[in-house]
Swiss-Prot record:
Subunit structure: Monomer.
Pathway, per record: Cofactor biosynthesis; adenosylcobalamin biosynthesis; cob(II)yrinate a,c-diamide from sirohydrochlorin (anaerobic route): step 10/10
InterPro entries in UniProt: CbiA/CobB_synth (IPR004484), Class_I_gatase-like (IPR029062), CobQ/CobB/MinD/ParA_Nub-bd_dom (IPR002586), GATase_3 (IPR011698), P-loop_NTPase (IPR027417)
Function description: Catalyzes the ATP-dependent amidation of the two carboxylate groups at positions a and c of cobyrinate, using either L-glutamine or ammonia as the nitrogen source. Is able to use other nucleotide triphosphates as substrate, such as GTP or UTP, although less efficiently than ATP.
Enzyme Commission identifier(s): 6.3.5.11
Miscellaneous comment as given in the Swiss-Prot or TrEMBL entry: The a and c carboxylates of cobyrinate are activated for nucleophilic attack via formation of a phosphorylated intermediate by ATP. CbiA catalyzes first the amidation of the c-carboxylate, and then that of the a-carboxylate.
pH dependence comment: The catalytic activity is essentially constant between pH 6.8 and 8.0.
Swiss-Prot/TrEMBL cofactor(s): Mg(2+)
Domain notes: Comprises of two domains. The C-terminal domain contains the binding site for glutamine and catalyzes the hydrolysis of this substrate to glutamate and ammonia. The N-terminal domain is anticipated to bind ATP and cobyrinate and catalyzes the ultimate synthesis of the diamide product. The ammonia produced via the glutaminase domain is probably translocated to the adjacent domain via a molecular tunnel, where it reacts with an activated intermediate.
Residues annotated as domain GATase cobBQ-type: 252-446
The name this protein goes by in its record: Cobyrinate a,c-diamide synthase
Keywords: ATP-binding, Cobalamin biosynthesis, Glutamine amidotransferase, Ligase, Magnesium, Nucleotide-binding
Record flagged with keyword Nucleotide-binding: yes
Amino acid sequence: MAARHHAFILAGTGSGCGKTTVTLGLLRLLQKRALRVQPFKVGPDYLDTGWHTAICGVASRNLDSFMLPPPVLNALFCEQMRQADIAVIEGVMGLYDGYGVDPNYCSTAAMAKQLGCPVILLVDGKAVSTSLAATVMGFQHFDPTLNLAGVIVNRVTSDAHYQLLKNAIEHYCSLPVLGYVPPCDGVALPERHLGLITARESLVNQQSWHDFAATLEQTVDVDALLSLSVLSALPAGMWPERPDNTAGAGLTLALADDEAFNFYYPDNIDLLERAGVNIVRFSPLHDRALPDCQMIWLGGGYPELYAADLAANTVMLKHLRAAHQRGVAIYAECGGLMYLGSTLEDSGGEIHQMANIIPGHSKMGKRLTRFGYCEAQAMQPTLLAAPGEIVRGHEFHYSDFIPETPAVMACRKVRDGRVLQEWTGGWQTGNTFASYLHVHFAQRPEMLQHWLAAARRVL
């Protein structure tokens, strides 16, 4: 298989149809066949990629067409495929659900066409028979240019029921039905308000996933799946100018990585390492000292769940404040912003003292405060952007940050050509910048260049 590349996108009819669970089972099943799998996720989600990584031991990558120009995204995809036999790409929401009403903008279908990958549609077979063929036919004819190559039916309780569904779909849609997935309670993924619980928090029962893969081996035609997933060619991609491997020479980045902070795109870490930055991981929860460093990155996560323990580690908070006062270039996203604030009020109303580097108070709410993609334009010099430069990213948080200083970014949400919302966000204090925005550095080479330049000022 090494001479040919294989890839497919597992798409769904909507959220909650079982894409993640079935993706994980297929990853494990393909590994059982001694194939080098590379998992991907369409869109910005961290949780699904974390589960991919935990199940197959290979860092899953995000394919986000809002943040990344097509040539860059394609280049990232091809880079990971160099050492892989097959890419298993989990779609986002329903097959044609994108950012707005255009099914060719930020949707799973658009990604399939951009990468030249066939689509396998996952449909729910519970309590339905021939009507399921009508559902498949609707997806099939909605965009005839899409390579909808096959179907897998989820939640099928018997072979007799499966044969009824298979015959109907193949008769009316002329699409191969590759198999079915029986109910498997042992691999149900735990959830909470932000969606799935992270694989890191959950004690992943590898035996359950091994058993699930063994079940799929009996109910899914893997040979047919592999036959349908052969790529004629990898997509054409091109990198913009990247910092060379001397740009970060001599710089050390302390990367927060524990139960409270662990939302990072592996591509971002790769870019820093390729620039020559030495990355040392540390735990704001458990460690008593910071690594010797010129840069600190506090990513997203769930600091609200560990607020008492974070507040109790006063030695770490003291070291963070000292690093800020020395001018260490500190960057924080979402949960990292909450940690750098003055106080954090958890969902129970208890207030915890945080680092007090970005003056302000974080308060957890019961509903999403902000969700989705946005553009942020720097109104003054920041760690990642010069005045006027635009950064694209996404927000997803139940907390609200009440600042005591003015924001430095003008943010807006534009969908279907209309500005839906405008607000300000992002706070710069000294050489520290924090915001709710999660970003992908590959979108603009200048982002890393700004951060590295700021870090060099403290060498």
